[in-house]
Amino acid sequence: MALSRALRCCQRIFSWIPVIIISSVVLWSYYAYVFELCFVTLSNNLERVTYLLIFHVCFIMFCWTYWKAIFTPPSTPTKKFHLSYTDKERYEMEERPEVQKQILVDIAKKLPIFTRAQSGAIRFCDRCQVIKPDRCHHCSVCETCVLKMDHHCPWVNNCVGFSNYKFFLLFLSYSMIYCVFIASTVFQYFLKFWVGDLPNGPAKFHVLFLLFVALMFFVSLMFLFGYHCWLVAKNRSTLEAFSPPVFQNGPDRNGFNVGLSKNLRQVFGEHKKLWFIPVFTSQGDGHYFPLRTLRESENPLLANEEKWVEDGGSDEESADENGSSLLIRTES
């Protein structure tokens, strides 16, 4: 027991190494750009002030989104998806697997659940003792079930899911903008140092490496950001792209794809003026999502999006009522 605790403690400590590396590179880039480029290399005051203003806007947005991606805790299923004491006792004492499955089916009929395991059974997490909502998965690193889990990202040392997916996307976008701005403004001075128009000194080293590091990070981020833009457009998570969710008629990668406009609003919210600001605006509460396979008139979550507001009582009641009838439809 003591050994396992020590190993988990070491794992938690080492898991911060990628974040420390990124933070160190960013802090160095701040010093190199502000002091070595703007204050040491640049001679034009107007150019210096302009570069500093734009740079600090990019730097603040990068830090803000990175902070939110790291420290926003992953959302977990609410109590209504956990087994009650009576159901848990009945489930654990039952030795017949087919009866255990039926117990979970009976409980799930009261919940807005449409997806199943590959075998067709109710998706149940033995570790968390919870019936998994649609798009929810257990993270072995965080040791909990995460709503609309996309992946566990070592570079933010956090699970990317429903609660912080918008922040993660903004982090990628502002990281690219940060790199592009640095590379585009440093390039002319890189050439001047390279051909010898500017004298050698500490600034030369920083300016040369600023360009290389900015370009290297931009290229890697460009592919990752492009991939996640495609996922958002299709309303898929990374896990769903590799293993499509299973519905009544089998696996369907486009099961949650309700159109580009609605897909974007699910992640970024209704108000476009808040799309590029790292504040939580995603629709719903992460437990249930509109389905493409149901007509809009039959899908209460798609036809009545105003019910997605975080109103615990009314939201749960409508979900219970609609979830039960719709679940029977998918199992028929």
From Swiss-Prot:
Positions of Zn(2+) 2 binding: 139, 142, 152, 159
Residue ranges, annotated region (Disordered): 305-332
Domain DHHC, chain residue ranges per copy: 123-173
Cytoplasmic topological segments: 1-14, 72-166, 229-332
A GO CC annotation given for this chain: Golgi membrane
Knocked-out gene: effects: Morpholino knockdown has no effect on development till 18 hpf. At 24 hpf, the embryos exhibit abnormal brain development with indistinguishable boundaries among different regions in the forebrain and a slightly reduced size of diencephalon. A reduction in mature dopaminergic neurons is observed associated within learning and memory deficits.
Keywords attached to this entry: Acyltransferase, Golgi apparatus, Lipoprotein, Membrane, Metal-binding, Palmitate, Synapse, Transferase, Transmembrane, Transmembrane helix, Zinc
Subcellular location: Golgi apparatus membrane; Postsynaptic density
Reactions catalysed, as given in the entry: L-cysteinyl-[protein] + hexadecanoyl-CoA = S-hexadecanoyl-L-cysteinyl-[protein] + CoA; L-cysteinyl-[protein] + tetradecanoyl-CoA = S-tetradecanoyl-L-cysteinyl-[protein] + CoA; L-cysteinyl-[protein] + octadecanoyl-CoA = S-octadecanoyl-L-cysteinyl-[protein] + CoA
GO biological process annotation, one example: protein localization to membrane
Listed Pfam families: DHHC
EC number: 2.3.1.225, 2.3.1.-
Residue positions binding substrate: 132
Modification note: Autopalmitoylated (in vitro).
Stretches in topological domain Lumenal: 36-50, 188-204
Enzyme class: transferase
InterPro entries, per the entry: Palmitoyltrfase_DHHC, PFA4/ZDH16/20/ERF2-like
Membrane topology classification: Multi-pass membrane protein
Bilayer-spanning residue ranges: 15-35, 51-71, 167-187, 205-228
Active site positions: 153
Residues holding Zn(2+) 1: 125, 128, 138, 145
Example of a GO MF term: zinc ion binding
Role, per record: Palmitoyltransferase that catalyzes the addition of palmitate onto various protein substrates. Has no stringent fatty acid selectivity and in addition to palmitate can also transfer onto target proteins myristate from tetradecanoyl-CoA and stearate from octadecanoyl-CoA. May thereby regulate target proteins association and localization to membranes. In the nervous system, probably catalyzes the palmitoylation of synaptic proteins and is involved in the differentiation of dopaminergic neurons and the development of the diencephalon.
Family: Belongs to the DHHC palmitoyltransferase family.
Free-text comment about domains: The DHHC domain is required for palmitoyltransferase activity.
Listed name of the protein: Palmitoyltransferase ZDHHC15B
